Amino acid sequence: MTRHDRLQSEPTIWLATTRPEGRPHLVPIWFVWVDESFYICTERRSVKVRNLLANPLASVALESGTQPVVAECRSRLVEAPYPVEVVQAFQAKYEWDIRSDQQYNVVVALQPQRWLMG
């Protein structure tokens, strides 16, 4: 399976951000791949969002240990209204309308700056 195929089909990525004191924060999270960027939808008050607001650099990895896909990314918050393509991608992949979710209320775009594997 190609990297592009996996970016479209795999259910989760591992997202690594850095806490202000320098410790890593690593979490699995649903994502979509749209226009050469990862998009996640999460809670505005989450640790990952606080970390990314302080330091917009992050790494992401697909789960497979035998065919690793790892990217270093620069993040940015995407305010509502969310891009139609992103909304449609979450709906198609997870049957989830991110526009109507009150808990998961922020979208983060992660633009790969460098692919380390994959």
Feature map (PLM): residue ranges:
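Extreme N-terminal tail/first-helix region
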Residues: M1-I13
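A generic local structural motif
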Residues: M1-T2, L26-V27, R45-V47, Y94-E95
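Amphipathic alpha-helical interface surfaces
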Residues: R3, R45-N51, Y82-V86
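Alpha-helix boundary recognition
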Residues: L7-Q8, L53-A54, Q91
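Short beta-strand segments
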Residues: E10-E43, R50, A58-A61, V70-A71
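Generic structural signal for secondary-structure transition and capping sites
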Residues: P11-T12, L57, E95, W115
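Charged, gly/pro-rich active-site loop segments
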Residues: Q67-G118
